[in-house]
Amino acid sequence: MLPMLLKHLSNRLMKIVSSFLQNYEAWRINTFALFFACGLMLTLVISACSTNNASNSTATPTGNQTATNQGVVVRIGYQKAATILSAMKAQQDLEKAFAASGASVTWAEFPSGPPMLEAMNAGSIDFGYTGESPPIFAQAAGNPLVYVAYDPWSPKAEAILVPKNSSIQSLADLKGKRVAVAKGSNTNYLLVKALEKGGVDYKDIKPAFLQPPDARAAFEGNNVDAWAIWDPYLAAAQAATGARTLTDATGLAPNRGYYLAAKSFVDKYPDALKTVLEQVKKRSDWAKNNPTEVAKFLSPELGIDAGVLEVAEKRRDYDVLPLTDEVISAQQQIADTFYKIKLIPKSVNISEIVWKG
């Protein structure tokens, strides 16, 4: 009896153990499968997210460009008489262009090119526009600036004036006379070339280095005998005083304008510089095709009659162009002339500071 009972219990125990082992193996396999499936799914999700992020990064490079201008302050120097930058300031062209990138714009007004480039040398502004002579004086003084584009302007847009009743009838008659001119300005070169044409040594005149407002007062008060000046001050003086034009720059000086930038700005923020030039080009194209509108805009800014300003606008040209070998060569000739007559202390190489961007 007992042996049979033990055999029955033994068989029963074996079945229980066998059942447990079978169930344990199934549980173990199922558990492994579950963890494997979860791991595979997590891997796929992570991979998909990584691919999506990489795709977005590649598809939106402008976001990176925007980040490069974030917090940048673009400081513009301008003259009221410099049509394009004055119009851009009034219309907030640059503020609108930089809004999405997070950059901001500030403006500083100057009476002429030389003090503007002095401010650039001092680190107060990043970008500006002048006639052909100021950057030469600035380079000779060690100013780290860069030519970034040029504007054709016009030789008709600058001249040497004499009072309508003056005894001066020719360029040779300027010998010994007192001539008002903004030192280092575009008309400084016109004066040099005009004297050369008239056979007069630069040392044989009495230059009165005056900014346009002071020069106008001196001219009207007969405190100077002649005045080398550019538009629109030229057109305004002709209309108000009946002054005679002794000569304009035709055949004497190209009278180009130059867009200039601080070298540090060019090196650190080339994308911001390109945005500035793009907006300058758009406003320049508008000015070229709308001289009457430009005159109406400038009139209250300058306190000059719109009709007078329209005369000035119609005898000049507009554009924003990269410097060519021809333009660089002409600018070098001006620099060499200034060095020859000791207006600048050392010779300079224009091509060394021309932007290649």
Question: Where in this protein do the model-derived segments appear?
Answer:
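Bacterial signal peptide processing site
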Residues: 50-52
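Pocket-lining segment of extracytoplasmic ligand-binding domains
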Residues: 133, 207-298
